[in-house]
């Protein structure tokens, strides 16, 4: 406290001292009372210390972080008076654990409640995925035409089978990045962009939007030639790597000659 015996009592300074005591992190309640006496004002500071910390619990039902890990973080503080400043530093350690494993939407709030037995409960929201929505973009970068969603060539199930991020799973940045790499590996898309939005009907959950720019998957080739067996001939080749929007690869080659006509058709179903 900055107020000392012999100093003038100032309410503003008293308020600052009160806040400083709270800020030390050791107390759950602080109250300053005054008594008038023959030699001046006597200040009585009543404090309620925090309880002895015995256990820290996470309330999340989908917790990635184990109870054992939480105990390991706080074990040196179990059996000592709870200091909220030191406690917050340890919460940051748990947050970094979530982040390092890719759970970047995890949020830890608290302590919500400190009971008299020294058990602290932390409120954890880990960012559960409500839905994964696909939006196809045109060359203009828009996902709608006259207010209606733009339809893509590729079937939705072809895209979603590449995704390990599913409704009901906990959002994981590393898993989603791997999902995007698999989508690029299909050679069906020029660009894949990700955005996140809250689910208004399910607070604490998130909707993932994938904005997809499809690339051209068909090619047509042709030519003229001459051979002893066919004479003058014309060739035509048609290749499509996303037939019927199912990621099927088709290849058709036609050769028209003076003496013969040949063709070759292949279909690869992935």
How should these model regions be labeled?
Residues 1-232, 237, 251-266:
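Periplasmic polypeptide-binding modules associated with outer-membrane biogenesis and secretion
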Residues 243-249:
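Short loop/turn motifs that connect adjacent beta-strands in outer-membrane beta-barrel proteins
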Residues 239-241:
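Short conserved beta-strand segments at catalytic cores or DNA/RNA-binding microdomains
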Residues 268-270:
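Conserved small/polar residues in nucleotide/adenosyl-binding loops
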């Amino acid at each position: 406290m900055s107020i000392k015996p012999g100093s003038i009592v100032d309410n503003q300074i008293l308020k600052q001292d009160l806040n400083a005591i709270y800020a030390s992190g050791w107390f759950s309640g602080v109250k300053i009372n005054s008594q008038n006496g023959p030699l001046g004002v006597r200040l009585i500071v009543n404090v309620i210390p925090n309880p002895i910390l015995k256990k820290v619990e996470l309330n999340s039902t989908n917790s990635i972080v184990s109870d054992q890990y939480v105990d390991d973080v706080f074990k040196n503080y179990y059996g000592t008076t709870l200091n909220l400043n030191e406690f917050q530093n340890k919460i940051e350690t748990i947050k970094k654990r979530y982040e390092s494993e890719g759970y970047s939407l995890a949020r830890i709030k608290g302590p919500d409640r400190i009971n008299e037995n020294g058990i602290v409960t932390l409120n954890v929201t880990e960012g559960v995925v409500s839905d994964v929505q696909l939006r196809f973009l045109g060359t203009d970068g828009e996902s709608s035409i006259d207010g209606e969603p733009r339809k893509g060539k590729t079937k939705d199930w072809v895209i979603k089978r590449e995704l390990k991020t599913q409704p009901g799973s906990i959002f994981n940045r590393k898993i989603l990045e791997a999902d995007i790499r698999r989508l690029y590996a299909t050679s069906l898309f020029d660009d894949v962009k990700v955005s996140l939005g809250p689910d208004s009907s399910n607070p604490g959950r998130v909707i993932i939007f994938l904005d997809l720019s499809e690339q051209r998957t068909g090619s047509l080739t042709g030519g003229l030639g001459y051979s002893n067996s066919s004479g003058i001939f014309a060739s035509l080749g048609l290749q499509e790597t996303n037939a019927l929007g199912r990621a099927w690869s088709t290849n058709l080659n036609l050769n028209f000659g003076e003496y013969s006509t040949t063709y070759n058709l292949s279909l690869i179903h992935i």
